[in-house]
């Protein structure tokens, strides 16, 4: 799969020459996970695996299987490229192999949106065996909420190859659309409807379904509201969203998230004899939640829900779903991660993952797994990029759009000192990857050039109002706490002698605090700022993403 931001970045690298006045060179970026639990509980028995199977922000997972290949996608909100594509052969060892929305033409609406509240929500990945085509359908939520959202889909015959241009679906309102391909060849889209009329009661929500013609690529007829929930006169329920439909043994099963996105989050299931319903709610719902457990328990996984289920070639069922790993004080920088658990079946024929006080544990065993989990997405691992390739790795993202006008790669990463800051709503000269551990060490080495006033270094992002920037800037090493608009604060600053050569920059996360260090050419690491509170970029400061970290250069005033 070709990544546009990366491919064009390299093309520019072949036609531009390095200008030390206007570019910063990054020699490498490394990331090392250091979570205590993984160190103290190694995988030793065949079948062992860690949850989350994709650590760090990997929310709203959707999965499908074709043959013995499993494919999974997650949300990206205001980041580009959109919709990471993961591949696995065993359900627990996942590799980030590409990005579905990798060209600017596939996702032209991100500029100016909130990084963690706007953009791409809840992509759903499906395979239609009747035309041997993969479909990814999603919503781009515009500023102002669901009423301004754009629902669209893209297709591909090969998920590792190119995906089509987006096809807009103006007839599909609301958010969280998902395809269902019935065994008779018919296709449908199920989605959460907007809350406009008729609103029947407080907090009214509805799920709708509409037929889809795979020949024309368009919807057929009008949407049918087939499941209504909310705070009504008979039951106190919160919004249903993220719906998926499955046909199992001749019955239609509807799964939907319920309860919002915080600790009361859950997944519920329904069953019907017809795809249009009526759907009967399972009497023992929720089929998945952790809201009944004590919040101060050891190593809690909270907010479990937004599930998708898949059947193995051997006939077993598994669920992927989102969850959170907060510290006991309820905060973290990881966001909502992707977990895997087996699906069980009740005596009355409904699927479920947990009941009552069942826990989502961090270490589990998958009997069919030969050996133990092998993954660069779970447990402690080291990730390093020397930027030696003319294409960047698929883990890298930018803010609000394509970063290629500002970067080139090959013998290091060169970022132009663009006069765009990382909070502006326009794409700055930065690339970022997800934080995947409470405790980690990330470092880079930068040759800043000689541009007066330019700043280059390590950037940590929660959203456009909450960031931290460890920068080399005009004879100083500076740690900024970046806030709303120009509300920026210098946390620490040290003057450095004029040096020739690369300067090392490092952040060590200790979970609730960060240590920031720098290293002059040929020297040792020096502490710049110790025990800096991490709450400035905590997940709980709002929005739906976790935090990211990477490298950044700017000539904008800080």
Labelled PLM ranges:
Residues 1-22:
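Bacterial Sec-dependent N-terminal signal peptides
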Residues 21-558:
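Carbohydrate-active catalytic/glycan-binding domains of CAZyme proteins
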């Amino acid at each position: 799969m070709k990544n546009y931001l990366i491919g064009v970045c390299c093309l520019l690298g072949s036609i531009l020459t390095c200008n030390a006045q206007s570019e910063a060179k990054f020699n490498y970026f490394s990331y090392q996970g250091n979570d205590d639990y993984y160190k103290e509980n190694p995988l030793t028995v065949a079948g062992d695996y860690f949850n989350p199977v994709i650590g760090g922000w990997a929310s709203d997972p959707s999965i499908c299987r074709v043959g013995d290949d499993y494919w999974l996608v997650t949300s990206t909100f205001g980041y580009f490229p959109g919709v990471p594509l993961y591949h696995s052969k065993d359900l627990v060892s996942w590799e980030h192999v590409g990005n579905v929305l990798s060209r600017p033409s596939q996702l032209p609406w991100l500029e100016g949106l909130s990084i963690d509240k706007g953009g791409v929500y809840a992509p759903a990945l499906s395979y239609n065996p009747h035309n041997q085509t993969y479909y990814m359908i999603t919503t781009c939520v515009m500023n102002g909420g669901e009423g301004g959202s754009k629902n669209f889909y893209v297709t591909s015959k090969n998920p590792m190859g190119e995906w089509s241009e987006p096809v807009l679906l103006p007839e599909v309102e609301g958010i969280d659309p998902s395809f269902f391909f019935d065994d008779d060849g018919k296709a449908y889209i199920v989605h959460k409807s907007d809350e406009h009329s008729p609103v029947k009661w407080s907090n009214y929500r509805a799920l709708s379904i509409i037929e889809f013609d795979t020949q024309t690529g368009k919807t057929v007829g009008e949407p049918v509201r087939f499941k209504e929930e909310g705070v009504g006169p008979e039951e106190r329920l919160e919004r249903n969203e993220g719906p998926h439909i499955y046909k199992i043994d001749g019955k239609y099963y509807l799964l939907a998230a319920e309860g919002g996105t915080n600790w009361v989050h859950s997944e519920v299931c329904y069953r019907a004899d017809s795809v249009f319903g009526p759907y009967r709610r399972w009497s023992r719902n929720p089929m998945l939640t952790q809201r009944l457990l004590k919040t101060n328990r050891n190593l809690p996984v909270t907010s479990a829900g937004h599930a998708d289920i898949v059947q193995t070639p051997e006939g077993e069922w598994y669920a992927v779903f989102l969850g959170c790993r907060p510290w006991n004080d309820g905060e973290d920088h990881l966001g909502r991660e992707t977990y895997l658990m087996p699906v069980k079946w009740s005596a009355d024929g409904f699927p479920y993952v947990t009941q009552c006080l069942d826990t989502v544990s961090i270490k589990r065993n998958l009997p069919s797994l030969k050996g133990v989990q092998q993954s660069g997405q779970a447990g402690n691992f080291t990730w390093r990029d020397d930027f030696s390739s003319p294409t960047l790795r698929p883990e890298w993202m930018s803010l609000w759009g394509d970063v290629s006008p500002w970067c080139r790669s090959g013998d290091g990463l060169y970022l132009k000192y663009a006069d765009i800051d990382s909070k502006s709503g326009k794409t700055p000269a930065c690339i970022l990857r997800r934080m995947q551990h409470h405790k980690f060490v990330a470092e880079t080495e930068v040759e800043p050039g000689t541009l007066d006033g330019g700043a280059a270094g390590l950037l940590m992002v929660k959203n456009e109002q909450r960031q931290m920037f460890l920068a080399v800037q005009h004879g100083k090493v500076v740690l900024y706490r970046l806030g709303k608009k120009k509300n920026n604060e210098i946390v620490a600053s040290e003057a450095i002698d004029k040096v020739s050569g690369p300067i090392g920059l490092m952040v060590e996360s200790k979970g609730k605090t960060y240590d920031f260090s720098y290293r002059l050419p040929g020297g040792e690491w020096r502490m710049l700022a110790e025990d800096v509170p991490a709450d400035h970029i905590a997940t709980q400061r709002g929005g739906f993403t976790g935090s990211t970290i990477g490298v950044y250069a700017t000539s904008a005033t800080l």
